[in-house]
Amino acid sequence: MRWKLLILVILTIIALSASSCEAKVRQYKVKVVKEYPHDEMSYTQGLFFQGDKMIETTGQYGESTLKVVDPETGKAVKKFSFARKYFCEGSVELDGNIYILTWREKVAFIYDAKTLEYKQTYSYPREGWGLTTDGKNLIASDGSSRLYFLDGQFHQQKALQVKMNGRPLSQLNELEWIDGKIWANVYMTDMIVIINPDNGNVEATVDCTGLLPRHLRDEYTDVLNGIAYNPETKKIYLTGKYWKRLYEVELVEKK
């Protein structure tokens, strides 16, 4: 009987320790290192580096585009516009292809990463929001608290429940893979979360409040959305929908 009681006590301690560890979410804010122009007509949905250029996908019906952007100037050096019936969402490059989701059209597109030529359309079973890759799988969000790991034909390999302090965290939007972690914009907030891809736990939050100052905002300025990591320089860039600036940032731990 005593052994059973001892085992129960040990299990309780382990459970409490695990819960305590899970609750210790690190908190960061951003420090602007440098700012760049960003096309204020771009409703940014996907953003990632390809060499020294950025690939950006933009949304809204009648405004959706796939662009190669010079980050120094914010200007598109190559641009493709989608039919008005498509609302494009997140995008990423994997194995020589650029994958692009759509919001509610139930399709996803594949383009050649070098030429930007159209290659294929796939059916897609859910809303498209954000998209990134761990180098092997596509990782997609749909606005819920789940992330979906997919192969190159959009077949689901696994689903990951994202939790912060033990509770599901929804509204996960644009995604970026940085140093083995998944960074996600939380839609309609100034917060980015850093997610452990193995267990779905949020390990840190990034507070971006005030990143775009008031004098650069107008009636069309929308939410923070757009994370890009340059693996060559190890630099992180942030922007938003209809923002006039792109920012290189560093993380500063909150005290």
Ranges and model annotations:
Residues V69-G74, D112-L116, D151-H155, N196-G200, ...:
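Short loop/turn segments that connect beta-strands within beta-propeller blades
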Residues E40-G51, R84-D95, Y124-S141, G166-G180, ...:
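Beta-rich, blade/repeat-based domains predominating
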Residues V33-T65, F80-V92, G240-Y242:
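Beta-strand-rich domains and repeat architectures in extracellular enzymes and scaffolds
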Residues G74-I110, L116-G128:
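Blade-loop segments of beta-propeller domains
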Residues K34-Y36, V77-A83, Q120-S123, Q157-V162, ...:
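Beta-propeller fold detector
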Residues A23-M41, P71-K75:
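A short helix->beta-strand "capping" segment at the edge of beta-propeller domains
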